[in-house]
Amino acid sequence: VLERSLSTFVDHPRIDGVWVVLDSADPRWDSNPYARNPKVYRAAGGAERCHSVLSALEALLVQAHPQDWVLVHDAARPCLRLEDLNRLIEELEQDPVGGLLAVPVRDTMKRGDPSGRVVATVERAHLWHAYTPQMFRLGALAGALREAIAGGDWVTDEASAMERLGHRPRLIEGHADNIKITRKADLPLAQFFLAQQGRLE
């Protein structure tokens, strides 16, 4: 899964480098073919997603400019389409804030209570599923994450950190097959989508 996700970014002509955030004791990374790729770097993971992302950004700030764009992507999303990645970059490279790939909500949404009872039906107009990659300026995103963590708000995506500071990230519509593999049952679905995209050998 990691190799599939990495290939999309490592092979992209407009991406200068890729930072992989892993547990410092991860035993499998050294056997990954990308471990020796000169375009790929490694950073230590943290307690939560926001800490891990900030770890990579802090390392990147040593060698990149704060105004450089960064893309943050879930390694568990190997089905990202190249066309979606290209659209994200092209649509946002002149944007003052940045943004993220997202998909409009099409299902009926319910809000529940702790006992599992419906409290309300949520109007789905203008609701979006937040996907990755999410694209922001390096310095701005690092600062937003530092501020969120210092405030005890362990945001679950980068856009949320930017929103806390009053920014309004742009939503770039992507494809719904950019799924996140979180359960074993997701693997066959990811394989199906990759086959449909012609990316399974």
Predicted regions and their residues:
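Conserved N-terminal catalytic core of the sugar/cofactor nucleotidyltransferase
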Residues: 2-67, 151
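Short active-site oxyanion
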Residues: 15-18, 97, 177-178
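Glycine-rich beta-alpha junction loops
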Residues: 24, 104-107, 176, 185
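Acidic metal-phosphate-binding loop of nucleotide-sugar-dependent transferases
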Residues: 49, 75-79
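Short aromatic/hydrophobic "clamp" motif used to bind/position activated sugar donors
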Residues: 70-71
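Conserved core of the sugar-phosphate nucleotidyltransferase
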Residues: 79-172, 201
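Hydrophobic helical membrane-anchoring modules
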Residues: 178-201
